[in-house]
Amino acid sequence: MKNVFLDFEKGIEEFEAKIEQLRFAQDNSALDISAEITRLQAKSQGLTKSVYAKLTPWQISQVARHPLRPSTLDYIKHLFTDFEELHGDRNFADDRAIVGGLAHFNGQTVMLIGHQKGHDTKEKIYRNFGMPKPEGYRKALRLMRLAEKFSIPLITFVDTPGAYPGIDAEERGQSEAIGKNLYVMAGLRIPIICIIIGEGGSGGALAIAVGDTSLMLQYSVYSVISPEGCASILWKSADKASDAAEILGITADRLKEMALIDTIIPEPVGGAHRDYPAVMQSVRQALQESLRKLQDIPLETLLQKRLDRLLGYGRFKINKPD
């Protein structure tokens, strides 16, 4: 699929267009213009580094939503072997916005669960734009319990704008399904690694993101509400989304400062969508290290640390004036 450039990448897009024109000309000419192509590539790379070194939270949210950004199934394809997808919640239906199943990671069996948005329009519609309904969360819950039954580590991939807000989802118990997952994940007797790979939208993300360690890609976002949603509530206009993104503290750096995530996984220059092999290697290393650390901790200690971690959220200290 052809690369898609964001609004703040216009200069980069112009360089890339010139490079493509020269490549086409070289293929159809006896002239050697490789030196000029190399020069433009260096300029494009330099500009990309400059732009991405000073991204605003709002711009980072756009990168997190990039249509070519690696999805759960992309990570499964590149990092795991022998993936066997498991379907259905055994109650109502199979929600395609949630994918999950058994796989091998470096020879070890793991359970994988993740949101799946899709890359093009057809797939996005098929996956309901990554917005799960109650049956999706109940499918995830079924797989979590299966992993616990066989003492298999759980790895979840978070990438959703939020849980589906439709009437049918509410009628089938959307809030109950999310709440049940939070409750069960808090006590699952297996190691749990959660990784935010794109958007972490509100309870729809949190329903598969309660674990022992939280990893987050550099240009992902994680928040109780989208910047547009927040702006619509506070200022009655989505035009204030950039201001809302700043206030919400949705970026990996801000969340790490507040101890809401544990590890920031670096992305290639220009974002994960520009270099799949590089980001896959970074995620692989982070998963290997996290899994090794968690499996070295005795189970009862792991569960107590998880409980302490959850109960510690939201605590703050007020310094009284003398």
Curated annotation (Swiss-Prot):
InterPro entries: Acetyl_CoA_COase_a_su, ClpP/crotonase-like_dom_sf, COA_CT_C. Pathway: Lipid metabolism; malonyl-CoA biosynthesis; malonyl-CoA from acetyl-CoA: step 1/1. It catalyses: N(6)-carboxybiotinyl-L-lysyl-[protein] + acetyl-CoA = N(6)-biotinyl-L-lysyl-[protein] + malonyl-CoA. It is an enzyme of class 2 (transferase). GO terms for biological process: fatty acid biosynthetic process; malonyl-CoA biosynthetic process. It is found in: Cytoplasm. Residues 30-293 form the CoA carboxyltransferase C-terminal domain. Coiled coil: none annotated. The keyword Transferase applies. Keywords: ATP-binding, Cytoplasm, Fatty acid biosynthesis, Fatty acid metabolism, Lipid biosynthesis, Lipid metabolism, Nucleotide-binding, Transferase. One of its GO terms (cellular component) is acetyl-CoA carboxylase complex. It holds the Pfam family ACCA. One of its GO terms (molecular function) is acetyl-CoA carboxylase activity. The keyword Cytoplasm applies. Its main location: cytoplasm. Its EC number is 2.1.3.15. It comes from the Bacteria. Acetyl-CoA carboxylase is a heterohexamer composed of biotin carboxyl carrier protein (AccB), biotin carboxylase (AccC) and two subunits each of ACCase subunit alpha (AccA) and ACCase subunit beta (AccD). Belongs to the AccA family. HAMAP family: AcetylCoA_CT_alpha. Component of the acetyl coenzyme A carboxylase (ACC) complex. First, biotin carboxylase catalyzes the carboxylation of biotin on its carrier protein (BCCP) and then the CO(2) group is transferred by the carboxyltransferase to acetyl-CoA to form malonyl-CoA. This is Acetyl-coenzyme A carboxylase carboxyl transferase subunit alpha. It comes from Nitrosomonas eutropha (strain DSM 101675 / C91 / Nm57). The lineage of its organism: Bacteria, Pseudomonadati, Pseudomonadota, Betaproteobacteria, Nitrosomonadales.
